[in-house]
């Protein structure tokens, strides 16, 4: 589509339809928007947009509504991301402050995202396999058993038993921990296992080949035993107030139960280029039958490429951006959702979560 005027008309139709969920006529566009042409010219342009697949006419005498192609063009080329209001930013900050645990934080994040968008919100727990190791401790439990306590960058605390032929003393255990922390900090569990296997052993210092290999094996096991991410949700009831066709609601709610499918979709969307870390799937783009009349907006959160960000004042295209998201956050609503607001809200909450996890919180033990 090359006509600037047609682009303006498409944008006006999408924005007006998002607001009122009623077919948009040429007369209404001429009266409301300063397009500089007559209703007849607008009507001709709308007919051309319909021929090109961007608009459709639900009834012969009615105006036009956007198609999936129209929404996609709007999201890619027309929708101007907007910063959240000071009140919305403060509500996010307040919601994520003072939580008792990581689970509590993620549930709060889902609730505040649902509140801002008026839609269904999903927040996944950090993936263990994607997390980075912050610190390890070794604690003696029995004659041939050590407790390996691993803390990730997200504050997740993982405890595993390590069997050893010879139990190192307290001083030796401390030295072993210091060595592992020096070589493995900010590595994934897989990288930790690989790094530990290359460390020189010191049998006199308690770091025997058997103990080294046992610790490396524990990290490998933690990498391989990854369970499906826990998903925190909020706002399912709000979808019943979103002008979604009644026949589409049951399949939509069925789709929301398929958490593994939703997780895979959200992770796929985080890799979309050109969306400032926010991915959007519209209708059939979700490849999920129950979401044919819905859209999914998703972003990753977690380990960031920069050490800090002033998230209190960040806008849509600034702030801490995850280099390798360890979890995802998303919003599901009708295809006529307010994309600009939803994308900004998903982006903002994901950045707040990234910063919140970086600064630290109470550990999530398992």
UniProtKB/Swiss-Prot annotation:
The keyword Repressor applies. Pfam families: HrcA, HTH_DeoR. InterPro entries: DeoR_HTH (IPR001034), GAF-like_dom_sf (IPR029016), HrcA (IPR002571), HrcA_C (IPR021153), WH-like_DNA-bd_sf (IPR036388), WH_DNA-bd_sf (IPR036390), WHTH_transcript_rep_HrcA_IDD (IPR023120). Keywords: Repressor, Stress response, Transcription, Transcription regulation. The keyword Transport does not apply. Belongs to the HrcA family. This is Heat-inducible transcription repressor HrcA. The gene is hrcA.
